[in-house]
Amino acid sequence: MASMLGTEKYGEISYFISIAILASTIALLGMSTTVIVYTSKGVKIQSTAYLSGIISAITTSIILFYIFINDVGISIYIFGFVTFTLITSNYLGQKLYSKYSKINIIQKILLVIFAVGFYHLMGLEGIILGIGISFILFFGIIIKSFKEMKIDYSIFRSRYKFILNSFLLDLTRASSGSVDKLIIAPLLGFALLGNYQLGIQYIALLHIVPGIVFKYVLPEASRG
């Protein structure tokens, strides 16, 4: 992607994706970890968590839509990211690792196809839009879950402290990976941010294995 865009445009797209990721994390309301942990315990929390995430994502998307002067790409990214994250969290909680792997691989393939395709049609805005669409295509899985289990907000009452802690933890993680880019871009420009982001990508590779281990251990430990 960087070789196709050049460092300045790559920095610009990294800046807007960082905004979208941070906003998406806020919109998730800590539901990702909550779904993983309580689904692994057999609690039927999915539909309630999905509805909460959808309402929050729509609200956040509308706010960002007007902030960025009717840029629908970021809004679609937020809604898609939230719903896709909740779907994969459910798979992890149920220990459906094969489904989790397949859906992630398919999404990554779709991401490349749509991001590159929409870039050639629309420019930089098309990349974020393409990524968002690659997430949203799996929304039907959430619709199906609404038919299989009822929405019950009483489930949250005794678990609000855990949900709050999960939200703060997720927000801290997202901030550590996004705030630096939000500072660098306005102060030093997109070109420098592009070079900075390229360097960060190599460091991110080192965190892939620990991240996979964490996602496997969390539902296992929650059951124990």
Residue spans for each PLM region:
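Residues that define the loop-to-transmembrane-helix transition and helix capping
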Residues: 8-11, 47, 98, 124-125, ...
